[in-house]
C-alpha cells in the first residue's frame, strides 16, 4: 500500500502550533536537496527551481545535494549541472547508496573540497546514451554525431572535475566502470569518505 508523500511537523517562527509539511519542503528549508530517483525533466525542473530560490535567499550559504540515483536523462542532468555552476552558493554533494551514470557526474560536479561519499556507496561511470536511434538514415547519422559530441564533452568535463587524463576517462567509460567510495576518492570523483552528516556540513 503506498504511503503517499512523507510529511513532518514544522512550526513557523512566532507561531504557537506546528503544521504538517512535506519532507521535501522541510529539507529545502535546511538547504538540502535529495536526488533519490532516476533523473528526468520533472526532477531536474524541481531541483533547478529550488537551487535558484535558495540562491536568491542566501547566495553565501552552501546548498547540500544528497544523491542516490541510477542516473537518467543527459539533458535533464546537464540542466542541473549548469545550474550548480550558475548559482553562487557552493554545492556540497554527498553520495548515499549509489551514484551511477548522470548521478555520478553530478556527484563529481560539486564544489571541489566539498564532494563526499558515505562508506558503502557505489559509484558507476559509463558513456552517455541519448536513447534509441530511429528514423531515416540521415536522422540516424545526425543523432549519432550528436551522441559522440555529448560523449566527448562529458568526458572533458569529467577530466576537469576529477583531474584524470582525458584518455583515461575515455577508456574507463567505454563500459560500466564501478568504484567503491574509497576508489571514487582516489579517482577524484569525491574528496572524502565520511561517516556523519556533520562532516559534510563542516566542509
Curated annotation (Swiss-Prot):
A GO MF term: serine-type endopeptidase activity
EC number in record: 3.4.21.92
Protein's cellular compartments: Cytoplasm
Alphabetic keyword roster: Cytoplasm, Hydrolase, Protease, Serine protease
Top-level enzyme category: hydrolase
Catalytic residues (positions): 101 (nucleophile), 126
Coiled coil (UniProt feature): none
InterPro entries named among the record's database cross-references: ClpP, ClpP/crotonase-like_dom_sf, ClpP/TepA, ClpP_His_AS, ClpP_Ser_AS
HAMAP family: ClpP
Record family assignment: Belongs to the peptidase S14 family.
Protein name: ATP-dependent Clp protease proteolytic subunit 1
Species name: Synechococcus sp. (strain JA-3-3Ab)
Amino acid at each position: 500500500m503506498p504511503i503517499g508523500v512523507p510529511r513532518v511537523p514544522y512550526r513557523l517562527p512566532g507561531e504557537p502550533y506546528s503544521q504538517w509539511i512535506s519532507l521535501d519542503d522541510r529539507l529545502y528549508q535546511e538547504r538540502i536537496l535529495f536526488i533519490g530517483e532516476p533523473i528526468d525533466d520533472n526532477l531536474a525542473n524541481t531541483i533547478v527551481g529550488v537551487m535558484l530560490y535558495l540562491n536568491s535567499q542566501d547566495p553565501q550559504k552552501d546548498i547540500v545535494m544528497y544523491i542516490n540515483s541510477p542516473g537518467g536523462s543527459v539533458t535533464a542532468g546537464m540542466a542541473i549541472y549548469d545550474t550548480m555552476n550558475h548559482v553562487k552558493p557552493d554545492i556540497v554533494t554527498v553520495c548515499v547508496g549509489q551514484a551511477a551514470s548522470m548521478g555520478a557526474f553530478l556527484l563529481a560536479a560539486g564544489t571541489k573540497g566539498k564532494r563526499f561519499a558515505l562508506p558503502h556507496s557505489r559509484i558507476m561511470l559509463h558513456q552517455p546514451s541519448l536513447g534509441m536511434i530511429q528514423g531515416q538514415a540521415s536522422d540516424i547519422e545526425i543523432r549519432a554525431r550528436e551522441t559522440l559530441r555529448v560523449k566527448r564533452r562529458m568526458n572533458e568535463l569529467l577530466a576537469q572535475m576529477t583531474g584524470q587524463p582525458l584518455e583515461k576517462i575515455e577508456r574507463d567509460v567505454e563500459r560500466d566502470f564501478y568504484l567503491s567510495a574509497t576508489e571514487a576518492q582516489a579517482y577524484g570523483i569525491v574528496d572524502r569518505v565520511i561517516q556523519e552528516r556533520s562532516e559534510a556540513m563542516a566542509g
